[in-house]
Amino acid sequence: MTALWLIVLCGVLSVVYAIWATSSVLSADAGSPRMQEIAAAVREGAQAYLRRQYTTIGIVGIVIFVLLVYFLGFYVAIGFAIGAILSGAAGFIGMNVSVRANVRTAQAATTSLAGGLELAFKAGAITGMLVAGLALLGVTLYFGFLVYSLKLAPDSRVVVDAMVALGFGASLISIFARLGGGIFTKGADVGGDLVGKVEAGIPEDDPRNPATIADNVGDNVGDCAGMAADLFETYAVTAVATMVLAAIFFAKTPILMSMMTLPLAIGGICIITSIIGTFFVKLGPSQSIMGALYKGLIATGVLSLIGIAVVIYTLIGFGKLDGVDYTGMSLFECGVVGLIVTALIIWITEYYTGTDYRPVKSIAAASVTGHGTNVIQGLAISMEATALPAIVIIAGILVTYSLAGLFGIAIATATMLALAGMIVALDAFGPVTDNAGGIAEMAGLPKEVRKSTDALDAVGNTTKAVTKGYAIGSAGLGALVLFAAYNQDLKFFVADSAHHTYFAGVNPDFSLNNPYVVVGLLFGGLLPYLFGAMGMTAVGRAASAIVEEVRRQFREKPGIMQGTDKPDYGKAVDLLTKAAIKEMIIPSLLPVLSPIVVYFLIYAIAGGGATGKSAAFSAVGAMLLGVIVTGLFVAISMTSGGGAWDNAKKYIEDGHYGGKGSDAHKSAVTGDTVGDPYKDTAGPAVNPMIKITNIVALLLLAILAH
């Protein structure tokens, strides 16, 4: 009981930190009336979009809530609601701070680079701490309520199902937020660039471009609210999956409760280390912004190592554990592996997307010979970028499995995600600096201010790319833990078919000789591609609508280009809001319905009865692995490739290969418009898709067992 209260205290601390940081950000100077006017337009657009998005999700959520009450009971449905509401809240609050911090960052940059950095990072840290804190509070308090208030056994089905449903609630918000936000932001970005930069020849964030405000709104709904929901979900889902595994592996042992609280305790201690880490972010004498941010991340990592050692030692000791053949020490070693995997994935992603390294420079060089060669080189880099992260994840799985079996992999993933607070802070720093640059440009601030905001924005682009790499790596491992939970859960029901009569005579066979397993693998493998295609098509459609709208305004109001007429910014925002909401629903339902359809389809094809059930459970399990395997590669290649295309354009804009306006620059803009939906819509949305498929399969087991 004390352990749970201490974990809750850590969660509360993160919320207190967020409140303190918010008041500190809001007390900063908000700049000139012109700057405030632009910021207000961005804020209104972002709030209007989120209201629509949450209303739509709310309708879908209520339907699922009712179904869960019917199939699995009230407490499971409440778990779903908690996950959904908290995930939505983290994104909503974070974004509301971010749209107020942008103008203050632009104003702070007029005095010093350090001031701009401090404000933008603090705004990002608010979202980060809310994500980690609310996810931890949601899981811990509901688990505590079920176990201590309702007096349910920690490994009872109600508790396990309610925890899985909580993860499902977070997942649902996450896939909608990622996809909807991504369609909005990239529709504006691609559409605005095609007409503004390529046709009209005006620079980025030029106030004459009617899509400018929509582009700045998009940064917030995509990168701030979208990323927050994504990592909230991975955090909650991994904690839940680790708890489910603990409930199965340590069912009849005295350490059951300690093992189930272990992932939560690791999360709790890492919130404290993340909060301490934020105070290390200071601009040093070298004036390296990335260096300042990495100082905070490294401090968090080192402190977390010590914290995790303390947590494991106090909860379960370093010695031999009941019921299994590994020690507490080997679980700590798995935690260390989790931190090493995090560091390596971040470093590899930066290598593939940073302007200082070979991949980005090679795309920039290829732009000299034209649009085609830019796209060819960009695609080559996007494929190459999958190799090293995959090898790191493979090594992580092998080492942790040999140390402590499946539970070791789960603890490594839980440790990886325990740093989510700091990582989301780095990510949410991106849209704040991006918007600050836009506001500085539109308000006509002096050149040296633009220089500061550009420097911050360039780093913001790298942090956004780096955190996407982390989000995918952790999602892949998290999904693997969920697959293990599916497999163990299935074994549990089959072994206990006296109580769960549906599973009588079922004998799932995951060997590769089973044709149903091969069918499942292939079916799972196609899902990320199909899902990615839907996302890309949606962006293409939204961008076309924006291109038409911007051209129409330029045609009907020739005064816009002379600066005598004002563009109608609201029209573009409204158009994108409608498009994004409409386009996000069908793709989001794909991973929700797939496991159910595959199960009943294979059940019917294999002739029903116990044989049909065995075939269907095997096919669904294989499908989950198929989704993880191709999903990982699709997501990494899209996010890293897109990031490299984007930064190749920035590299040329910095004066290489002829600089802005050169032929190489025009080719690089083409590459960037391809890379945009790659890295900000389809790629990141594959993350929640992988996990939803796995969670729905777990819930399907629970429903069939009832």
Curated annotation (Swiss-Prot):
Catalytic reactions of this protein: diphosphate + H2O + H(+)(in) = 2 phosphate + 2 H(+)(out)
Site location (Determinant of potassium independence): 464
Pfam family, one: H_PPase
Residues noted as binding Ca(2+) in the record, renumbered to the chain: 646, 672, 676
ATP-binding in keyword set: no
Domain of life per record: Bacteria
Species of the source: Bradyrhizobium diazoefficiens (strain JCM 10833 / BCRC 13528 / IAM 13628 / NBRC 14792 / USDA 110)
Family matches, as HAMAP family: PPase_energized_pump
Biological role stated in the UniProt entry: Proton pump that utilizes the energy of pyrophosphate hydrolysis as the driving force for proton movement across the membrane. Generates a proton motive force.
Residue stretches spanning the membrane: 1-21, 62-82, 83-103, 128-148, 164-184, 231-251, 261-281, 298-318, 328-348, 376-398, 412-432, 465-485, 516-536, 585-605, 616-636, 685-705
Family, similarity comment: Belongs to the H(+)-translocating pyrophosphatase (TC 3.A.10) family. K(+)-insensitive subfamily.
The protein's required cofactors: Mg(2+)
Keyword field: Calcium, Cell inner membrane, Cell membrane, Hydrogen ion transport, Ion transport, Magnesium, Membrane, Metal-binding, Translocase, Transmembrane, Transmembrane helix, Transport
Quaternary data: Homodimer.
Location of this chain's protein in the cell: Cell inner membrane
Residues engaged in binding Mg(2+) 2: 216, 219, 434
Protein name: K(+)-insensitive pyrophosphate-energized proton pump
Residues holding Mg(2+) 1: 189, 193
EC number: 7.1.3.1
UniProt site positions, description: Important for ion transport: 178, 223, 230, 680, 691
Chain positions recorded as substrate binding sites: 186, 679
GO-annotated cellular components: plasma membrane
Gene for this chain: hppA
GO molecular function: diphosphate hydrolysis-driven proton transmembrane transporter activity; inorganic diphosphate phosphatase activity; magnesium ion binding
